[in-house]
Amino acid sequence: MSSEIVPIAEPIRPADGGLGAAHASVAVPKGGHWWFRLLAFLGPGYMVSVGYMDPGNWATDLAGGSQFGYLLLSVILLSNLMAIVLQGLSARLGIATGLDLAQACRARYPRGINLALWGLCELAIIACDLAEVIGTAIALKLLFGIPLTLGAIITALDVVLVLLLMNRGFRALEAFVMALLLVIFVCFGIQIALAAPPIAAVLAGFIPRAEVVTNPHALYLAIGIIGATVMPHNLYLHSSIVQTRAYPRTDAGRRSALRWAVTDSTVALMFALFINAAILILAAAVFHAQGRTDVQEIEQAHALLAPMLGVGLASTLFAVALLASGVNSTVTATLAGQIVMEGFLRLRLPPWMRRLLTRGIAIVPVVVVTWLYGEAGTARLLVLSQVVLSMQLPFAVIPLVRFVADRGLMGALVAPAWLVRLAWVIALVIVGLNLKLLWEFALG
């Protein structure tokens, strides 16, 4: 990637992005109690948090809990703190400039680099969609006995859901996503209560221990957790959807909006921390505690939960949460895809066409691999999707950090020096760990 940031060569309006009529469509109270302003800003953070608990993260958390107990909870906490910083920067970019990350790249980079960044981001969205197809198909099989191949094809029908929600406005999208997040929260809350993990051991797991880096198997899983935590398309998504709020486009209005937006995303990502930690805690309390350190796949975990906990409801709750996770990811991935395509290319497709195109590309490998290699093949395909996401991540993080440090672009909301330094450290850690993960993957 070129190190030069070129001046804006063409005017870019916020309406050029993927929000359309949703731009500044959510009213923000100008007075009254602070609680009402907070409620007005709640939503984008929860949309973003979906990417931190999608089906692609489940296998890593399950493997970490079953193999190492509560050891890797500290890694989940660390990766979540990294995500909070980067998503805060994404919101800062959108609020300060009125541009999303894709628009900022188009404005500041030459055409060739933009096309490359767009292609890489589209690849990441397809990889994310691949994980959603697999997760949703597995959930349909676990709940209704639908074969994986047929379940993967059925997921194409989610375009109807996306269309219905988009036609009802952006707040309807947010409400739907938050309702399904609540379903996931309740499902795992009940499962954790049934598993009754030792509180002292859980709390101790959040304290970093040397074994995380001295044990090569634990380190490998730790890299996987961190590498899969920050979804590249989330950085594009967040910088766009924070602009749905009708805050005053003045320095004071933007500063206030930034405070509320960061509060929203921080609280939402702590919610995601609970879900990811709950998956690992469940695996540790049920599988690791009883000597089953080999549980790494979603279907395997589902099959073992009921007999090992002695409660049939546990497996059902697990599958319901998985289905909610897959459906939720569908909504946010569709929106991110529109934002990326319209931001980089100024190419606007109808949402149903965009959704069918992306989902169609994702369904084909799932159907083919399931037909040729069975369910074990889909598990490997799920891992591959996370590796593809890891490959794209640096190409979203690095432009973001460079932009928020540019006073000419950000104006009064330029990121402070300490935050920029912290962001570069996080970026280097993520890039380094992803490179190591890719190297390990290449070596088998």
Swiss-Prot record:
Superkingdom of this protein's organism: Bacteria
Membrane topology: Multi-pass membrane protein
One annotated GO biological process: manganese ion transport
Keywords linked to the UniProt accession: Cell inner membrane, Cell membrane, Ion transport, Membrane, Symport, Transmembrane, Transmembrane helix, Transport
Residue ranges that the Swiss-Prot or TrEMBL entry lists as coiled coil: none
Entry function: H(+)-stimulated, divalent metal cation uptake system.
Cross-referenced NCBIfam families: nramp (TIGR01197), Nramp_1 (NF037982), PRK00701.1 (NF001923)
Name of the featured protein: Divalent metal cation transporter MntH
Protein source organism: Xanthomonas campestris pv. campestris (strain ATCC 33913 / DSM 3586 / NCPPB 528 / LMG 568 / P 25)
